[in-house]
Design a protein with these regions (language model features):
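Acidic, serine/threonine-rich low-complexity disordered tracts
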Residues: 1-154, 192-281
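Acidic/charged, solvent-exposed loop-and-adjacent secondary-structure segments enriched in E/D, K/R, S/T
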Residues: 157-178
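Anionic-ligand-binding alpha/beta catalytic cores of soluble enzymes and soluble regulatory domains
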Residues: 177-194
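Short, mixed-charge, low-aromatic patches
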Residues: 81-83, 166-170, 187-190
Length: 281
């Protein structure tokens, strides 16, 4: 999900937060994406039963019919971040991470705004299953350019190429929610030194990333104060296509939400997102 602070005209294919700088789609890519249905603009606007105009069931009945594993997933959540950093001088902006679910369907988005330098919007939609999130559509928009991935039995990349779909694969937006959920439900060890593999599908390819649990840090957040958070650092890919990497801090006291995200390209070029507010239904 990459928001590359290193250059306003360059984004990196290897950042686990995002994929490479969008390019004009090939005819094959345009045809491939055109074959797939467009993602829902809003889960709230979609009839849960899939029939327009059908009366919605009573709330109690709908909850009773939901699979039991949904109880482990949070309700609608919105995190806002203060964005700082450096690129030929100080950077200032804002960011937010959104999570919505309706039954077993989910929608999550990551948005960054650094004024004229960079704007980025990443979205993921798919299903919540007993084994975790199962993305179906991932799209990213960097400035005015948009690219996407469709995930079915296989993964259809932006250029139309189809590749195998690894078990448990996530995308650059869904990874934050999936990792939070695995931590909150005890599926992942938070012990320092733990290595956490995670497949990520992006417009340019599917790669297996490995996050190392570095340890636990005390973060001083603008409004939330001092918060202890687990520090996840990604290892470089075996065949790196650039120096960008994104580190994530998850707070155990705040449902393991990602309270800090730092995107780095070199010692003097970085963006640092610190959680400012958390809203949850």
């Amino acid at each position: 999900m990459a928001p590359a602070p290193a250059s306003p005209d360059t984004a990196d294919a290897d950042a686990p937060l995002a994929s490479e700088e969008p390019q004009a789609p090939s005819p094959a890519a345009s045809a491939a994406l055109a074959e797939s249905p467009a993602p829902d603009e809003s889960l709230a606007a979609r009839d849960p039963g899939g029939q327009d105009g059908a009366a919605a069931p009573p709330a109690g009945a709908a909850r009773a019919a939901e699979p039991g594993f949904l109880a482990d997933w949070p309700g609608d959540t919105r995190l806002t971040y203060t964005l700082g950093g450096n690129y030929r001088g100080e950077l200032h902006g804002s960011a937010r991470v959104l999570w919505q679910r309706e039954g077993t369907r989910y929608h999550t988005a990551v948005q960054l705004d650094v004024g004229l330098l960079l704007s980025m919007h990443l979205t993921s939609q798919g299903d919540i299953t007993a084994t975790g999130l199962q993305p179906a559509v991932y799209e990213e928009q960097v400035r005015q350019r948009r690219r996407g991935v469709r995930l079915d039995e296989d993964v259809r990349l932006h250029n139309g190429q189809r590749v195998a779909r690894p078990a448990g694969v996530q995308d650059a937006a869904s990874q934050f929610v999936e990792l939070s959920h695995r931590l909150a439900t005890g599926q992942l060890s938070a012990e320092p030194g733990t290595a956490i593999p995670l497949w990520l599908a992006r417009p340019g390819g599917v790669d297996e990333w490995t996050y190392d649990v570095v340890g636990e840090d005390t973060l001083h957040l603008p409004r939330l104060g001092a918060v202890r958070a687990l520090h996840f650092r990604p290892r470089p890919l075996a065949k790196p296509r650039g120096p960008i990497h994104a580190e994530i801090w998850f707070a155990p006291s705040l449902q393991y939400l990602p309270v800090r995200i730092r995107i780095t390209q070199g010692p003097d070029t970085f963006m640092d997102l610190l959680a400012d507010t958390i809203e949850q239904q």
